[in-house]
Each structure stands twice: as C-alpha cells, then as structure tokens.
C-alpha cells in the first residue's frame, strides 16, 4: 500500500506505517553519512550540544553528486545503512524519528527503533537519478568541511521509499527472504 506523508513525520504517521509499505515523503529531511555521524556521536558522548536539532527529524544516508543544471542535487542514492549502525541508537534516543538508507540494520538499531517508536525506511539503490528529481532544494546545516558528507536539509516532494522496519520491529529483511527461497 502506498502512503503519502507530509513532513515533519508525526508519531501517528509512524504508528500507521507497516513494514513493506511504499511511502512518498514531501517536506523536509536532513542528510548525513559516516563522517557526520561520527562527529555527532562524539558530541553526544561528551554531553555537548549538537550543531543541528535532530528531534523529530528523518535523516537520509546520502552523499549526493554535484547538481546538473536545473536540479537541486546530482544523483542522490542511498548509502549502505550498516555503516551508521554504531551511531543510530544514540541519535534515536535523542529524538531522531527515523532513517532512510539501504540494507539491513543490526539488532541494536532495531531495538532502538522499537524503544523510541521510530521507523527505518529504504530508498532504492540504483535509482539515484530518480531520487534526485524528488529533491527540490538543499542547504548545508553543518560540517561544510565534509563536502558531500556535510549535514544538509533537503526539501523533497514525493520522495520514494519503503518501510523496512516499522515501530513494532517488523523487519522486511527478516520476513521477506523466506518467501522467495526454493523449497
């Protein structure tokens, strides 16, 4: 079932999302990858204030290519999410509502999603140019020195993704593969 969500995402939106749902997001999301996550995590460990307010946000794991004329960003496909697994539970505990990436997550991340009633969405790897069309604008929020890995804010319209792990811990990476195994 395809669902349209206007961001910022609400607790009610998240509660109504089920693993396997197709979702089109419109509104504002933030971005960040490995290097930015490491810096945010280090600040959390020191008890310091983050340079960006993550409370209520969805973060997209992406490092976009340079924009072509007429586009806000270049191809903007998802980064493998496991690279942020060390950092995700701390961010969720601070109020992050969810993440957008690709691939499975470890048990600690799934537990943090359930504990915080969050969500993990996946964007389609290989569809970077299509995804870029849904990104209408961007601005750098912090860590500009990281180049493509700087934390940014994207305004998106009908950004396509799939619910991989819902707030109850239902996980397509566990439930779907057995359906396709040869018996």
Give residue spans per PLM region.
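Short, structured beta-strand/loop micro-motifs enriched in basic residues and often containing a Trp
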Residues: 1-9
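Feature captures the catalytic cores and cofactor-binding loops of soluble hydro-lyases/lyases
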Residues: 31-32, 36-159
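Active-site/ligand-binding-proximal alpha/beta "capping" segment
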Residues: 88, 164-183
């Amino acid at each position: 079932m395809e669902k349209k969500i206007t961001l910022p995402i609400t607790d009610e939106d998240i509660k109504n999302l089920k693993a396997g749902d197709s979702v089109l997001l419109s509104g504002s999301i933030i971005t960040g990858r490995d290097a930015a996550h490491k810096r945010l995590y280090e600040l959390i460990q020191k008890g310091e204030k983050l340079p960006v307010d993550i409370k209520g946000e969805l973060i997209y794991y992406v490092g976009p290519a340079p924009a072509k004329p007429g586009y806000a960003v270049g191809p903007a496909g998802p980064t493998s999410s496991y690279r942020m697994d060390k950092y995700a539970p701390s961010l969720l505990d601070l109020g992050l509502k969810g993440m957008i990436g690709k691939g499975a997550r470890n048990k600690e991340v799934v537990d943090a999603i359930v504990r915080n009633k969050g969500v993990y969405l996946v964007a389609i790897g290989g569809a970077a140019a299509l995804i870029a069309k849904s990104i209408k604008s961007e601005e750098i929020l912090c860590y500009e020195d990281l180049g493509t890995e700087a934390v940014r804010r994207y305004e998106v319209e009908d950004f396509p993704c799939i619910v991989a792990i819902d707030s109850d811990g239902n996980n397509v990476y566990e439930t779907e593969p057995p359906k396709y195994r040869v018996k």
